[in-house]
Amino acid sequence: MGSAKILSFTLLLFVGYTLVHGSTPKHYIVYMGDRSHPNSESVVRANHEILASVTGSLNDAKAAAIHHYSRSFQGFSAMITPEQAKKLADHNSVVSVFESKMNKLHTTHSWDFLGLDTVYKNNPSALDSASNVIVGVIDSGVWPESESFNDYGLGPVPEKFKGECVTGDNFTLANCNKKIIGARFYSKGLEAEIGPLENIVDSIFFRSPRDSDGHGTHTASTIAGSIVSNVSLFGMAKGTARGGAPSARLSIYKACWFGFCSDADVFAAMDDAIHDGVDILSLSLGPDPPQPLYFENAISVGAFHAFQKGILVSASAGNSVFPRTACNVAPWIFTVAASTVDREFRSDIYLGNSKVLKGLSLNPIKMEGSYGLIYGSAAAAAGDAALNASFCKEHTLDPTLIKGKIVICTVEKFTDNRREKAIIIKQGGGVGMILIDHNARDVGFQFVIPSTMIGQDAVEELQAYMKTEKNPTATIFPTLTLVGTKPAPESAAFSSVGPNIITPDIIKPDITGPGVNILAAWSPVATEATVEQKSVNYNIISGTSMSCPHISAISAIIKSHHPSWSPAAIMSAIMTSATVMDNTHSLIGRDPNGTQATPFDYGSGHVNPVASLNPGLVYDFSSQDVLNFLCSNGASPAQLKNLTGELTQCQKSPTASYNFNYPSIGVSNLNGSLSVYRTVTYYGQEPTEYFASVERPSGVIVRVTPAKLKFWKAGEKITFRIDFTPFKNSNGNFVFGALTWNNGKQRVRSPIGLNVLST
């Protein structure tokens, strides 16, 4: 579903109102803080009365209202003008008013790569204990008939669960079981903004929790899919599919349609999920950059209330590539970047001179014989520039020149639709595509004709062959799945990057996990992105959408082992046990040229589920710590009172954000010497000593006091100081290092990021 279609319906919906009132209404969320109320009818009445104060009448208020939030926090959403929204923001019971923006979805072997078998081998009870953990998934729904959601061997639904199985199109009570224990759907917000879903042409959808997109099915099965053997995509990545926590339960919240998720619908889903009693909440979605302020963003607000209730919220960092584009960056959200695993999908090219070029693709189609090669630039349509044709854009290629040939195209920019190029070639009579993509080390795509992507080394060989051969030919081979490739992991080229645009002292993203070429369950009616648009039950896709459920699953495993741990403790355990080394014992890289990745790419590093179960030391923080953090970022006492339901005063000297007890250490404006403080809690059993070691950021002297921490029993807390003394400016860039505590058994590592403004 294209954004242009959605935009056209939005314009049609509001044009009449604009003519009458002279001001276009927009969809706003009116957030009123932590005042949940069991009597939803009284809340609705109160919301209508508040809304009527700006609309002029109760009837107009009822017509404008879309969602009412009352289960876990209070508020509503409504179609109102910017002027009316401004008036509501001044109401004494309102924390904030912000426009409901559109979020986007951040679109087997990975668990072996992470060593998850070791977790279950060393902890045989893990599968049983995980069955009491409930993971809420806010996404595009679920395909319940997938074998990944069978409930063989699972016990009764946990008594703590208060959710529902909501029926609808092609979805009955029988579609829920002891694996999918709850399912809801939300579309009011999106329909208020774009009109009825039925108006979206050429799109299959179900007005129910059933997934027509595939994305939600994929993420849910990655988290908690049951073990299913002999799974593949057209023979690729063949093996056993499973979720990271295959005994965990799933509660599905469908808030995304056609790849878009209205803030107001996501907020409603979070309101329900918190009330339903989920333990982990997974969101593979987020806003386009720039990231909205914390309390002008539905995900940040909803996640704060989840954090208060002991629910960890794991969310994808986004696929926006560039610096300062990471989303979902509130410190109470676990922000997940994407990285590769040690598996490649090779679709090589056999040239007419018998040389073989390395290509990457998800290409199951066998090409019979060899075909002529032609550059797209040499096949430009009449009146079109060769440059445009080299990118194989629509209407730029001459069908008479490409018919029966393999066309060599070039990626113009990172955001190019690579699949579309193959469609254009097929429509013109071409039989294959070689796509020059200098980032061709990551994502495997599916195409409608035999196609493969090549990087710089292969490009040079191909160009040399094309220059010397009068009638060049080639064959594109079907994909072979190679396991054990090196180096891995690498930061995914598409993964959004820090620094945190709102609070740069808080390093974001937090962690990275497998997000490239991940095989998981799929909706068989979602055929738009598959080879020749064929129906499949399992699919391979990439994105931070795929890495997020890996972290959600590992969080669920830790929660099952340590039910009393706070969300912050679970985050800390995963972050401080992460690795920054690949399988060649080198630092994790970012691109094919060997550029090293930084904490702005991978946060604290690549997740290590085995080590995260026994972290040794934890950087914990509470809801009160978050409130102190908000004070340092300008929150008023009135906002805090509405937020928490209690009178909360900010300290006269609020704690600086670089002293927030986060597992990473960031200072975005280092002017001369500075002391930063952290407190660790001992999560071991026996007396032990930890010793500090520092990887020093360039141009900065670092001293840790005390440099030795002695613990006698579990639960002990010790505060230490890190003194930074810069002797060289960093010229507007961050310099990185790390602090590690080590007791000979556990290493507790925190990345350091400093922007040195003056010495």
UniProtKB/Swiss-Prot annotation:
It is found in: Secreted, Extracellular space, Apoplast. Residues 28-105 form the Inhibitor I9 domain. This is Subtilisin-like serine-protease S. PROSITE patterns: SUBTILASE (PS51892), SUBTILASE_SER (PS00138). PANTHER family: PROPROTEIN CONVERTASE SUBTILISIN/KEXIN. Residues 390-462 form the PA domain. Glycans are attached at N170, N230, N388, N593, N642, N671. It holds the Pfam family PA. GO terms for biological process: arbuscular mycorrhizal association; proteolysis; response to symbiotic bacterium; response to symbiotic fungus. Residues 110-613 form the Peptidase S8 domain. InterPro entries: PA_domain (IPR003137), Peptidase_S8/S53_dom (IPR000209), Peptidase_S8/S53_dom_sf (IPR036852), Peptidase_S8_Ser-AS (IPR023828), Peptidase_S8_subtilisin-rel (IPR015500), Peptidases_S8_3 (IPR034197), S8pro/Inhibitor_I9 (IPR010259), S8pro/Inhibitor_I9_sf (IPR037045). Belongs to the peptidase S8 family. The active site is at D139, H215, S545. One of its GO terms (molecular function) is serine-type endopeptidase activity. Keywords: Apoplast, Glycoprotein, Hydrolase, Protease, Secreted, Serine protease, Signal. It comes from Lotus japonicus. It is an enzyme of class 3 (hydrolase).
